[in-house]
Amino acid sequence: MIEKSAGGRYRVRVFHRGTQVSMKTFDRKKDAETWEAAQKLSVQVGGWIDPKAGAIALASLIEKFNRERKGAVRDHSWDTDESNLRLHIPMKLARRPISSITTGDLETMFTAMMRTHARATVRRHRESVSALFAFAVRYEIVRENIVTKVKLAKGNGKKAREIAPFSEKERDDLISLIRATKPQHADVIEILALTGVRWGELCSLRVFDLQEKPYPAIMVRESESDGYNPADPKSGKTRRVPLDDRAAEILRARALSKNRNDRLFENARGNKLLAAGLTRSLGWSSIAPGKRVYDLRHTAATIWLQSGIDIATVAAWLGHSNSAITHRTYLHYMKTDSDLSGIARINARAAAKRLEMGVED
């Protein structure tokens, strides 16, 4: 109902089942009627949100978002969102009520960030902001997640880092160098390069994850990134990664003197490996300039594709949620094939190479 005050203003009161659920005052009757109609429609279709709920400042909502999700999501996911929202939300925007924030405000924020950051970094920030607004929708603070309406510009900021896989010769030379100078680390580097597992996934591998039937493989069930407790792999699902002859040989040898639940890889003290300790011990920046340990994963993927293994199979081995990610990342390295035939090709290639070098099995 609309009531005109003695001062000439129009007060709107909206009721639901006999209870006043909303009230607002306007200078013009037309504005009051428009607002009343929108509120009544929201009540009727079940999309009504108390306008007072949207008065919470964005900064306060972020605090609530972080507090409610702590321990309920993966630690790494929580840290990523917390960091993005803390570092990349302008203070001027953080002070405003969430209900006042528009798609234009968000587009301005993302566009400004694009000038100084790689598009992939801005995309991850957008994902964190979207998670925040989705949280606000679930808690009936706002009606919709407006972030979904904001598209990122192509960007002219920092160039995204391209993948830098090792060639087969570079990979083999690197492993030979490490076996000669730091043999305790050689198996780690070689398995990363042969299986394409992520660092955290390698750290979580146990003896019982090594399987022989129906073919040699490892079961990737968990990921234990540095500084975090074990969690599901990035895809959220267990996956089977077939082993070529060399990878199977290395892992069988490592499993021989261990118990079923022991880690396949650990440091000299029998504790979890740390990437920083490994790269420091190896002098990684000197022996592999311009490359990251993560590029060993790209190395495995590109060699698989060059061996004729089809994109869907490579995606499954890498633990990608869909083959579109694999296609986008390794577009220039693709051929075709699948599990057993793929491993047969890799083994045949390795055997031919050994024969060329005069090395017998």
Feature names for model-found ranges:
Residues 1-27:
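Short, Arg/Lys-rich segments that mark the N-terminal edge of DNA/RNA- and chromatin-recognition modules
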Residues 2, 215, 225-247, 257-259, ...:
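C-terminal secondary-structure termini that scaffold catalytic or DNA-interacting sites
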Residues 6, 149-155, 168, 173, ...:
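Conserved tyrosine-mediated DNA breakage-rejoining catalytic core shared by Y-recombinases
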Residues 8, 123-127, 138, 142-205, ...:
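Basic, Lys/Arg- and aromatic-enriched nucleic-acid-binding interface segment
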Residues 22-27, 63-141, 146, 160, ...:
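N-terminal core-binding DNA-recognition domain of tyrosine site-specific recombinases/integrases
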Residues 28, 224, 248, 318-343:
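Catalytic-site neighborhood detector that most strongly recognizes the C-terminal catalytic loop/helix
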Residues 176-186, 195, 241, 255-264, ...:
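Short, basic (Lys/Arg/His-rich) helix/loop patches that form interaction surfaces
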Residues 209-217, 309-329:
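Short, polar N-cap/turn motifs at the start of nucleic acid-interacting alpha helices
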